[in-house]
Swiss-Prot record:
Species this chain originates from: Caldicellulosiruptor saccharolyticus (strain ATCC 43494 / DSM 8903 / Tp8T 6331)
Signal peptide: none
Protein name: UPF0735 ACT domain-containing protein Csac_0995
InterPro entries documented for this protein: ACT-like_dom_sf (IPR045865), ACT_dom (IPR002912), UPF0735_ACT_dom-cont (IPR008310)
Coiled-coil features, chain-numbered ranges: none
ACT domain sequence ranges: 72-147
Lineage: Bacteria, Bacillati, Bacillota, Bacillota incertae sedis, Caldicellulosiruptorales
Gene3D superfamilies: 3.30.70.260
Length: 150
């Protein structure tokens, strides 16, 4: 669970100590029901129970932490008819609640759009949503601008 008074960082997986990655893997095994107990999970991933309990509430995948939040997406799109509609349909199909849409006037065939969505009822992960939007022809760039609790 996120602590309101803590400082958080987004860190690339490749620079994390191995113990953190193993804690994440153990948590995934437990969440997916692939193991029934912490003892079994830590044994499979090769860490001690004390390491698991020390870090389990301090490390989690970024997209997992976006569940139940409001996220703001920034997109750079080609100026082609229907592209924004396709993106909004993809978001809607995940059961996300679209809160705001801001689109700038296209310049040089490119338009920038920001979309804020509530993620609590989504049927897909934020990562899957972003990957699906990236596959739309004409999407040049998509990134998460911000995230906040509600």
């Amino acid at each position: 669970m996120l602590k309101k008074d803590a400082t958080y960082y987004i860190v690339e997986e490749s620079v994390l100590p191995e113990v953190f990655l193993k804690v994440i893997k153990a948590k995934e095994l437990l969440e997916k029901g692939e193991v029934k107990a912490v003892n079994e999970a830590v044994r499979l991933v090769g860490i001690s129970r004390s390491a698991f309990y020390k870090y389990k509430d301090c490390i989690f995948p970024f997209f997992e932490s976006s569940r139940g939040k409001i996220i703001t997406l920034a997109l750079v799109l080609q100026d082609v008819p229907g592209i924004l509609s396709k993106i909004l349909n993809i978001i809607s199909d995940t059961n996300a609640n679209i809160l705001t849409i801001n689109q700038n006037i296209p310049l040089g065939g490119i338009a920038t759009v920001t979309i804020s969505i509530r993620t609590s009822d989504m049927t897909k992960s934020v990562k899957e949503l972003i990957q699906e939007i990236e596959r739309v022809d004409g999407v040049k760039k998509i990134e998460i601008l911000g995230r906040e609790e509600y």
